[in-house]
Amino acid sequence: MRPSYFISDLHLSEKHPELTELLLRFLRSAAAGQARAVYILGDLFDFWVGDDEVSELNTSVAREIRKLSDKGVAVFFVRGNRDFLIGRDFCRQAGMTLLPDYSVLDLFGSNTLICHGDTLCTDDKAYLRFRRIVHCRRLQKLFLMLPLKWRTRLAAKIRRVSKMEKQVKPADIMDVNAAFTARQVRAFNAERLIHGHTHREHIHHENGFTRIVLGDWHNDYASILRVDGDGAVFVPPEEC
C-alpha cells in the first residue's frame, strides 16, 4: 500500500525562503505524488493572523498543496501553536482537510494518535493558560475583526515575548509530560503517537507504545516521517 508522510514545525516565513523551497520540493516530489496521504501537524507557518491575509508565501504554498491534492493525495492539517488561526477558507483553498487537536488513524493496522504536541506539555502552566485564552472563540472572532496591520503587529509582539520567555524557561517543562502523554494514548486506545512541537526528532519506545516526535525544519534540513507497512522511518529530502 502507498505510504503516508508526516511533517510539522516548518515555521514558514518570508525571512526563510529556503524552508519554503524545501517544502515545495517535497510537495512536487515523486514520493509525495505517490503517497496515500500527507499530514501536516501544525506550525506550517511561523505565524498566522487570518485567512484574509494574502501574500506570495501563503498563495504559493496553498497552490502547491492543492496540486498535490488534485493528484489524489489526501492532505490533512492539524493546527499548531503558531498557526492556530488557520481556518476553513485557507484549507479549502489548499485542498486540505482540517483535523481536530487529536485524531486517531488506522495506519497499516496500527491505531495511531496524532496531534501537534503543545497540549502534551502540561508542565508549562504559563503556556497552557495562554493557550486557553487565545483559543477562546469569542476572542478569536474579535481579533479577526481588527485591521490586518494591527493583527500583524500584535502577533509580532507576542512572538517577541514568547521568544524571551523561552530563553529563561527550564528545558524540561517545554517537553511533553510522560505520564499525561501515556494517559492520552491509552484514552484514545492507540498504540502509537506522532506529534511535533518540541522539535526533538526521535522515535521513542516507552510505556507500551511508540512515540514519534517530528523535528523542526531549519537551514537545509527537513524532518519528514514516512509510514508504510514496514513501519515508520525518517527520510531525508533527497529520497523524496
UniProtKB/Swiss-Prot annotation:
Major place of residence: membrane
InterPro entries recorded: Calcineurin-like_PHP_ApaH, LpxH-like, Metallo-depent_PP-like, UDP-diacylglucosamine_Hdrlase
Superkingdom of the source species: Bacteria
GO term, biological process aspect, one: lipid A biosynthetic process
Known catalytic reactions: UDP-2-N,3-O-bis[(3R)-3-hydroxytetradecanoyl]-alpha-D-glucosamine + H2O = 2-N,3-O-bis[(3R)-3-hydroxytetradecanoyl]-alpha-D-glucosaminyl 1-phosphate + UMP + 2 H(+)
Cofactor(s) required for function per UniProt: Mn(2+)
Assigned EC number: 3.6.1.54
GO molecular function: manganese ion binding; UDP-2,3-diacylglucosamine hydrolase activity
NCBIfam families to which the protein is assigned, alphabetical: lipid_A_lpxH, PRK05340.1
Stated name of the protein: UDP-2,3-diacylglucosamine hydrolase
Biological classification of the source: Bacteria, Pseudomonadati, Pseudomonadota, Betaproteobacteria, Neisseriales
Encoding gene per record: lpxH
